[in-house]
Amino acid sequence: MAKLLSFSDESRSSLERGVNALANAVRVTIGPKGRNVVLEKKFGAPDIVNDGDTIARDIELEDPFENLGAKLIQQVASRTKDKAGDGTTTATVLAQAMVREGLRNTAAGASPVELRRGMEKAAAQVVAGLASRSQAVEGDSIQQVATVSSSGDEEVGRMIAEAMDRVSVDGVITVEESKSLATEMEVTEGMAFDRGYSSPYFVTDADRQVCEFENPLILLTDRKISTVIDLVPVLEAVQKSGSPLLILSEEVEGEALATLVMNKSRGVLQVAAVRAPSFGDRRKAALADIAILTGGTLISEDQAMTLDKVTLEDLGHARRVTISKESTTIVANDNHSEAVSNRVAAIKRELDATESDYDREKLNERIAKLAGGVAVIKVGAATETELKNRKLRIEDALNATRAAVEEGIVAGGGSTLLQLAEDLNALAAQLDGDQRTGVEIVQRSLTAPVHQIATNAGHNGDVVIETMRQSGQGFNALTGVYEDLMATGIVDATKVVRLAVQDAVSIASLLVTTEVVIADKPEPEPPAGAGGEDPMGGMGGMGGMGGMGMPGMGGMGMPGMM
């Protein structure tokens, strides 16, 4: 494919236009009075969202160079989201301000490399300052963090705090859609473990990059599955039942994985494969625990059981399964409470008998996973659009609360960043030249979140910043009052703020040092119907898997598994 090249100031200017296009769409959502953004969908009603990462991922610009700038900011949002679960809008606002200041100084003749070094030194001091100001989460702080992160929704804050109280701060909490208008929370049996899907083609929700099944069947085995022939009987039975299927095994690979992926892609069978947690004997124990939880049978080599003899009666059942790239959560049906209790009692007896500290640790983990349960927050709303928006807010609030438990909290509303900006004066005084300018770039940019929060609330951002500096108080954008935000419960998770600063500095400093941009040259679209080809003709070759020697699959409408 031919390439387009752009150099020097022209290249940086095009990147900045892309950065601004995306950041301007995202920044309106920050703060308790942030606005919503409407996203057009190819099918169905548009989405109305207040989530920075969702907005960023939906933006694609026509100009290839500007689009690269937008993609860089998308990376800021997604990296912050992946590591902290929240803070994407703050990171975007910071990155935009740093890019603007950095490119302005570069155009004036500053050394991009020295600017970058100064920015990195400033970021290191800000991170240290956050750590020194951070306070551990205790008491009502959990509810306060959740409330602030959900844009002031006290019901959400109370519900998340209650969920963490019921299943512990390290417990499993999931968010799902309710069949009613009310938002409610319940605790049910379930389990989560650190294993994700074996292939990204199993994803059912492309926006969130997760695979979700309602009322799935679960095949449990400690075997490695390489060929599909052993799975044919159970796959036929599951396909006829109409239920989704989750396969938990030592590993699904090769021909078996390719066949499952193809039939999932064709819509023939809703299926996903996940590697079982742990290793060796502990893997077998974990699979046995899941079998008890779901009412299934573990197809084990130790008992000379084979996959070709599996029936629907051997499969486990769950209310819901959510699989991400790195983890799997199973929400059980509560139909096997007695069996789970007996299993926990048996593990406790094993715990009493062991003298190994390592074994004790692993046994306690198994007990916690089995007995801890899963807190399920069911989100209700009057319309589907409102439901999606509310669900995103609750997920963000939950992620921010977990981050707060991990690294503590600082005063919110951008007030901590404003204080840390003042502290950079001493660092700037120690440096000279363009490194000092790099520190000043970060210093000025740290005021951007406060400025935007105030602007979204209908106040003059410059006036608010100056008043905060003179009074030493934070600005409550919800009430318009200057007060001690930590004392009034307006707090941010330290981890979220830290990652927002680090990711923003990382991308901005790289962009400032960019000299050449290379993009793909857009190819003209061919006229409709050109060449007289069938637009779906490319699918015809998928019938060629008939050579696998499984003619019995043809009768169930699964030609790809023949």
Curated annotation (Swiss-Prot):
CDD domains: GroEL. Its main location: cytoplasm. Keywords: ATP-binding, Chaperone, Cytoplasm, Isomerase, Nucleotide-binding. It comes from the Bacteria. GO terms for cellular component: cytoplasm. GO terms for molecular function: ATP binding; ATP-dependent protein folding chaperone; isomerase activity; unfolded protein binding. It is an enzyme of class 5 (isomerase). The keyword Transmembrane does not apply. Signal peptide: none annotated. PROSITE patterns: CHAPERONINS_CPN60 (PS00296). Belongs to the chaperonin (HSP60) family. Forms a cylinder of 14 subunits composed of two heptameric rings stacked back-to-back. Interacts with the co-chaperonin GroES. NCBIfam families: GroEL (TIGR02348), PRK00013.1 (NF000592), PRK12849.1 (NF009487), PRK12850.1 (NF009488), PRK12851.1 (NF009489). This is Chaperonin GroEL 2. It comes from Synechococcus sp. (strain CC9902). The lineage of its organism: Bacteria, Bacillati, Cyanobacteriota, Cyanophyceae, Synechococcales.
